[in-house]
């Protein structure tokens, strides 16, 4: 819940209501078959760093959970750090960020690295420490996923380098960046 008072006594209240549900399978996300195959091939690597970027509300977290569903097997240990946990999945170890209690993305990432993960998903790469830990984790044999609030893949690289990432380590770690937008679709009952 967010409230925003303004001059003149007008106040807006925004509520984000999250429905618990299953992740959407990759084949139902609306990717073209070619792009879906490329994503599946890229995220099937044993280690590296993969980002999903786009504006607020573009489905970044939904896409990441679809990817995790694709990779989720009984012998794969997957840890997620989310603010908040929006989609729950059986077999995932999901941790909710709680800034008031001092539980932030960087702290949780450090804990994950001691928990022998195969795959780590960080809901959002907000600061240099979190991004650095993601790069380090990917270079030490983990598959790491995260989101960025940027409008394009090239803009994501610029943002990460501006945060102070070492260009050589970052280049070694990066598997790919998926930039996405939600596109309005008419239902099948509509006619032009």
Spans of features found by a protein language model:
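Short, flexible helix-loop junctions that flank or precede catalytic/ligand sites
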Residues: 1-192
């Amino acid at each position: 819940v967010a409230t925003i008072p303004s001059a003149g006594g007008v106040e807006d209240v925004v509520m984000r209501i999250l429905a618990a549900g299953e992740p959407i399978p990759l084949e139902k996300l609306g990717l073209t078959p070619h792009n879906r195959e490329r994503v599946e091939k890229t995220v099937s690597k044993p280690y590296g760093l993969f980002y999903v970027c786009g504006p607020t509300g573009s489905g970044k977290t939904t896409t990441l959970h679809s990817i995790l569903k694709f990779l989720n097997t009984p012998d794969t240990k997957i840890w997620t750090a989310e603010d908040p946990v929006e989609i729950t999945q059986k077999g995932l170890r999901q941790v909710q960020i709680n800034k008031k209690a001092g539980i932030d993305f960087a702290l949780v990432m450090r804990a994950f690295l001691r928990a022998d993960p195969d795959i780590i998903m960080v809901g959002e790469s907000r600061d240099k420490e979190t991004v650095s830990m993601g790069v380090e984790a990917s270079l030490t044999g983990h598959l790491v996923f995260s989101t960025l609030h940027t409008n394009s893949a090239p803009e994501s690289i610029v943002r990460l380098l501006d945060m102070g990432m070492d260009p050589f380590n970052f280049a070694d770690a990066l598997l790919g960046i998926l930039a996405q937008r939600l596109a309005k679709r008419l239902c099948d009952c509509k006619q032009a």
